[in-house]
């Protein structure tokens, strides 16, 4: 996993992502496709990362085909639902919705996507490595989560976390418990669609100061629509909205 990695592509410049949504329809992009792992890119990564531990380098040489196989299995399961999800994406793209309503629909779709893909991913074992990297979300989603878990989110004006992108096992999510995510049913959209399509968690294990490619499922459509329905709101890390996790003041 790369040190600066977080579950938002382009999160340093959300306005750029938003403008991209305005130019591109996304209704046909729901089907999972690897972000990396095609055309031998993982083989190339293995050669370029000679400084990584030997087991990681060896895995990089096989991760692409393994992940592609898992994606194919997922696609078979996903096919009957693709048209409905594509229709929802088109609706959210074309029609005006109240922000909260649109975000609820998108989060529900992300949960469905996650439930279908997880059995074919390394995430089926809920390894928790990604619970130690920045997780970006909007103020609107923070409010939705806060309402669901009955915790009042703070309102960060600037996100030091998303600028500095600290990561490591010394930076756990405030909702992480010894048994896993303490708000799993309410977790951010970014967490729902962040799926390693390899066979196990080896490439997700955090190595200080080292970048490790991970064959992620393609959730670009979710990210793009998220920026549209939240109207380009600034993003902040989950730790900045909920620094004390479930120990924060209960919302009214």
Which residues are covered by each model-predicted region?
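Short loop/turn segments that flank or connect secondary-structure elements
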Residues: 2-129, 133-180, 184-252
